[in-house]
């Protein structure tokens, strides 16, 4: 007989409000999946900071129904260079009195909670009473050796091959006075952090119960679109692009087809990688 032991969960009594702040650029293919994922688990509001180029994609039409229902608010950050930290501070400063918790995940980061189907129940546990923010480790979903985009859900396309990493993303408590956020991972050294089990000094990395599925790469085509557009933190130099490409092949299978595709789309010579394949 199989014995299943569920964790003992002690909840606070009060109702809480949860929002999500995210910087988004060239995410029209995936943004609905992202919104529906967090809506399904009980998030009250999503603040989407539109960081597309001035003449680039636009969220207003594709998100019109969510905007009408006031579930989504789009904030104009179009054309801004490396504005991630500025976005986090702006979102928190304007809204910290209205929400108990702020999810500060990227647009390709999907939280997984094994024992909860509602994030409010998870966050309302007494184990988090003394935590200023809760950190979740990320597990990269590999490219599944897919070169091109497919019009399917991310979970269908990249359902296996999880690569765990040591970096994490936070869910931050609201109503912290005069808070200045300095980083996207460790927000502020003065804040008390806890892991997803409420422990402040436990460095155990969990990738099975409470963690983030990080669809950072997707297919080779989509990864290179990400590389070419840049991110919200670093300047998009050739050196930065090359660092990301090396990281891509550290985690995903290196093939000549992928290398040739990346060279063609970035204009960066990857001869040193081709030599590794021939060895």
For each feature predicted by the language model, list its residue ranges.
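N-proximal low-complexity "stem/linker" segments adjacent to membrane-targeting elements
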Residues: 1-32
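Short acidic/polar active-site loop segments enriched in Thr and Asp
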Residues: 44-45, 100, 132
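Active-site-proximal specificity loops/subdomain of glycosyltransferases
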Residues: 58-101
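Short, acidic, metal-binding catalytic loop of nucleotide-sugar glycosyltransferases
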Residues: 36-45
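Short beta-strand-to-loop acidic/aromatic patch adjacent to the donor-nucleotide binding site
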Residues: 99-112
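Catalytic-site signature of metal-activated, phosphate-bearing donor transferases
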Residues: 84-89, 113-279
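Short beta-strand/loop segment that forms part of the nucleotide-sugar
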Residues: 44-53, 75-78
